[in-house]
Amino acid sequence: MLEIDWTTEEPALAAGQLLVVPLREGHDPEVISARFGTAVRDAVAKAPFLGKPGESFGFTREQGGAMQHVLLMGTAGLADPAALRQLAHDAAREAQRLGASELLLDLHGADGLPADGDDPLRTGSLLAQGLELGTYVYDRFLSEGNRRTPSLRSATAWGRSAAPADGTARGQIVAAAVAKARDLGNGPPALVTPTYLANTAAEIVDTLRSEGHDVALTVLDREQCQEKGMGCFLGVAQGSDEPPKFIHLAYRPKTAGAGKPTRVVLIGKGITFDSGGYSLKPTDGMLDMKLDMCGAAAVIAAFEAAVRMQVQYEVHSLVAAAENLVSGGAYKLGDVLTASNGKTVEINNTDAEGRLTLADAMVYAASTIHPELMIDFATLTGACIIALGPRIAGVMTNDEPLYADWTAAAARSGEEMWRLPLPGNLKEQLKSKVADMRNTGERYGGAITAGLFLSEFTQGVRWMHVDIAGPAMASKPWGITTPGGTGVPVATILELLAGDIKTTAS
C-alpha cells in the first residue's frame, strides 16, 4: 500500500521523483513557460501537446542538484470521478515505468476538482483509488526473473485545499477490494476452485474478527445443500469432481443507521470454470471462463471492504460456487431440476447455468436472511455484451428507488451501468411443456429473459440483477483496468453501502 499525503504547500524536490502536472485543452502556453521555461514551452508546442485527454509530454530536468521526471498530462477536467481517478492511475503507472519512488501530483492549478467544492473526502478517495490501482499487476505465476519490483512507494498531492485522511483511507480500502476481486478472477481455475473461494472467505473472516468486527461465515457442503433442496445449484455442480460450496458471509454493524434497511444481501455468481457443459463452448469462448466467477469475487471482496468501512447496514454476501463441466454424471439437456422454492426447471441449455445457481441463492437469501433488498451480480449473458458493449453493465430490477440509488452510486464510482426492461411478454419464451419453466428463452433478448428467469425467485424481496458479463473482464487495458479481471462493480457496491439506501419499495 502506498504512503499517500496531501499538502497545500509546494513539496520539496528530491531525486527519483515524478512530477505530474494536469493541463486542459486550450491552456495558456505561458503557464508552462512560467513554470518550466521557454524551452519546454516551445518543445511542448512543437510536439504538439494540446492538453487533450490521453495526451502527455514528458521531460527530465535538474533542479537543486536533483534530477526530476516531469509529465504534463492532458485532461478534460477533473470534476468527473472517472477522469480524476484516471489521472491518478495513469500518473502512478508512469511512475512505475520510470522507476520513480515518489510521485508528486500537482493539482494546485487544476480546476474542476471536487475538493474545490464541498466534497474533499470524495476527492481523496478517488485519488487514492487511482494511485493504488495504477500500481496493480497480477504476476503471481511469473518466474522471478520476469517480475518487476514495484518502485513507487509514496505519492503527494499538492492542491489548493487538502483532502482529509479519511478520504484517502477509504479510497485505499476500495482499491484493495478491487485488487482482491481482480486477483480472484485472474487466478487459474485449478487454483481458484469452490473450495478456494470458501477458504478465502474463511481467511477474511478470521482477519476481520481479529480486528474486532462482528462477522460470521457459513459454508454448506453438497449434502447440506441437498437438505435445503438446492436442486438447481447441485444440478450444475454434479458434472465436476470438485465439490460445490455454498458460502454465506455475514456482517452486523455495532450501530444501525436510523431509517436504513437492516439487511442487504449481495449474491455473486460463482462458477469457477464454465465449459458450457453438454452445450459445450468453443475454445475461444472457453478461454476466459475462469473469470465466470467475477460476481463471486466482487461480493467477497466488497464484503471485506464494507466491514472495514464500517457501513451501517447488515451485509450478507452469498456465493453458490461450482464448476460447470462435462462428465458421465453431468446434467443434460432435457433434465428437469427442482429449485429450493419448489419450481421445476427444464434444461434446454447447460451453458445457461449461472441463473440456476443464482436462483437457489436468491431463495436462500429470502427464506433464511429475510433481507430488505438483494442484488445479484453475474457474468451471465453474452447477449448483454451484444446489447451494451463490453464496458457497460446491464441492470434489471423490480424496485425503482433501489435502481435510483444504484445508478447514483455508479455515477459517483465512475463505473458504467444501463437499465434493461423486464417486459412480461417475454416470459412466454420461458414456458416449458414438461416443467414450470425452462432455463433459456429464444435467440433475441437473451439478457432480458435471463433477468426474467431470476425474477421468479425473488420471493417478494426488493431485488436488482446486474449483468457484468462485459465490464467484469477485459481483453486489453482500458480506463483503470488491466487485461483479465477488472474488479467491476466493487466500487459501485461500496458507494451504495456507504450512502443512504431508500427504504420505500416500489
Regions flagged by a language model, labelled:
Residues M1-G270:
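Short amphipathic alpha-helical segment within the helicase RecA-like ATPase core
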Residues L197-S506:
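A generic structural signal for tightly packed, nonpolar segments enriched in small/aliphatic residues
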